[in-house]
Amino acid sequence: MSQAAAQQPSRKKTVISLLVLLALTCIIVFTFKDHWAEITTALAQLSVWQVLAVLAVGLSYPLLEGCVAWVIVRSRLPQFKLRQGLDVGWCGTFGNVVTLGAGAVPVQLYYLHKAGLPLGPGAGLMTLEYVFHKSTVLLYATVMLLLQRRWLAANTTGVMRYLPMAYAVVAVVIVALVLLCVSPLVQSLARWLLGFLPKTEKWQQRRADWLEQLEVLGTESRRLLADKPRCLKIFALQALKLFGLFCLPYLCIRFMGLSPLDFWQVQLLTSLMLFVSNALPNVAGMGSIETAFLLVFGSFLERGEVMSVLMLYRIASYYVVFAASAVGFFIAQRHLTQMEPPKEG
C-alpha cells in the first residue's frame, strides 16, 4: 500500500472544506427561518447545566471512538496507549470534516504509520473498525425495531411507512460489507468479479491495489476475529457509543419539554434515523442526518419542535465535536513529534 494512502489534510483543502461547511450551515439555517422564533424560544428555556450535559454526551462519541481504536490497534501494537487511541479518534473526526467525508481513514493512517503500524495492517484495522461500527448500528436498530415494532406500526403514517424498505436496503449493504471481511467465499467471489475489469493499464493497476487491500483485510479480520474477548470489548464500546448518541435527542426533547415520547421510543427513532441516513448522500457528515431526522421525528413532533431538537442535537453531536476534534488533531500532531515508533507485536 502506497504512502500516499496516509496523509494529513493540506491547509488549502482545510480552508475550502471549512468554507463549504459554512455554506451548508447557512443553507440549513435558511431552511429553518420560518420557525426561528420557535427555535430560539425552545433553546432559551435551557439552563447552563442542561446545555453542558447535552454537550458532554455529544463529546462522549468521539472519545469512545478513540477507545475503540485503542482496543483494535493493540491487537497489532500491544504498547499502543489509550492516549494514542484518543488521538486516532480525533484525527478521524477532524479528517472526515475537513476533507468533506473523504479523508478520515487517510488521516488516521498517517498517525498510525508514524506510531509504528505499517500502512497495510493499519488500513485493514481501520476498515474493520468501520465494519464493527456498521454492524453495531444494524444490531442496535434491529433489536429496537423488534422490541417496539407494534408501537411503531401503530404510529407511523405517510413516508414513514417506507422505513422497512430503507431498513432492508441498508441492512443488505452492511451484511455484504461484513461478509466481505469475514467470509473466504465472498472474498473469493470479489476477486473473481475484479477479473472482469477493463484490461487497460489504469484499471489493472486499480485491480492490483484492490486485490492487495482485500488480502490485507482478510488477514487482519482473521487475526482480530480469532481474539473473541477483544471483539466483545469492541462491540460493547460501539454499543455504548451509540447509546450515548441516541440519548441526545431524548435529552433535548425533555429539557425543552416538547414531547410525550418515552426514553426507549426515542432510542428506537434515533437508531432508525441513523440507519436511514446511511442510505442518503452527505457532504462532510451534513445533509443526510438532517434529512433523516426531519423524516423520522417529523411524525411525532410539530415542525417547529423537531427543528428545535435537531438544532440542539447537531450543535452537540457535530459542531462542538468538530471544534473539539480540531484541538484534538493538533494535540495529536504534537504527540507524534514526541513519540518513538514501537515495534509491531
Q: Which residues fall in each region the model found?
A:
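Transmembrane helix-loop-helix hairpins in multi-pass inner-membrane proteins
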Residues: 1-41, 92-204, 282, 286-345
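Membrane-embedded helical hairpins/re-entrant loop segments and their flanking transmembrane helices
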Residues: 64-94, 252-269
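Hydrophobic alpha-helical transmembrane segments
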Residues: 51-55, 82, 86, 123, ...
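A short amphipathic helical element positioned immediately N-terminal to and/or at the very start
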Residues: 37-45, 213-226
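Membrane-interface helix starts
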Residues: 13-16, 45-53, 222-236
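Membrane-water interface at transmembrane helix exits
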Residues: 29, 40, 69, 73-77, ...
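Transmembrane helical segments that form the transport core of multi-pass membrane transport proteins
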Residues: 221-272, 280
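Membrane-helix interface segments
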Residues: 10-11, 47-49, 78-87, 117-119, ...
